[in-house]
Swiss-Prot record:
The lineage of its organism: Eukaryota, Metazoa, Chordata, Craniata, Vertebrata. Nitrite binds at H65. GO terms for molecular function: heme binding; metal ion binding; nitrite reductase activity; oxygen binding; oxygen carrier activity; peroxidase activity. The keyword Iron applies. The keyword Iron applies. This is Myoglobin. InterPro entries: Globin, Globin-like_sf, Myoglobin. It is found in: Cytoplasm, Sarcoplasm. The gene is MB.
Length: 154
């Protein structure tokens, strides 16, 4: 299920575009997640009061959390699948503290792909999309394995 060097290069090329403006990408990813899957909002005490897209766009806390999410994911993607050290604390917190189901990781993966398609159509063609989907699936599968080790059936 691993990615080829070429696929990792496609992933990291488009991720460079994300890193050029992490706050707006993170905000758009979370808004896309919450609009597409409103049930995910219930996992975020800080955001569950945000009902409209305008309220979400105006929230500095939401923007800050988007930066946190995409910064952590970027660190994992740059490891090209060798992300054990980065994944362990993330899985620990998401399984034991936040209780985030693996399904929600799939939802946010879809939101990431959607935002990248929208913001970077010229740099995120079919090959890059396929590579990113594979990289995010690898991340989710490894998170699910860690969840299982921790006894979380998310």
């Amino acid at each position: 299920m691993g990615l080829s060097d070429g696929e990792w290069q496609l992933v990291l090329n488009v991720w460079g575009k994300v890193e050029a403006d992490v706050p707006s990408h993170g905000q758009e990813v979370l808004i896309s997640l919450f609009k597409g899957h409103p049930e995910t909002l219930e996992k975020f005490d800080k955001f569950k009061h945000l009902k409209s897209e305008d309220e979400m766009k105006a929230s500095e806390e939401l923007k800050k959390h988007g930066v946190t999410v995409l910064t952590a994911l970027g660190g994992i993607l740059k490891k090209k699948g060798h992300h054990e050290a980065e994944l362990k604390p993330l899985a620990q917190s998401h399984a034991t503290k936040h209780k985030i189901p693996v399904k929600y990781l799939e939802f946010i993966s879809d939101a990431i792909v959607h935002v990248l398609q929208k913001k970077h159509p010229g740099d995120f063609g079919a090959d890059a999309q396929g590579a990113m989907k594979k990289a995010l699936e690898l991340f989710r599968n490894d998170m699910a394995a860690k969840y299982k080790e921790l006894g979380f059936q998310g």
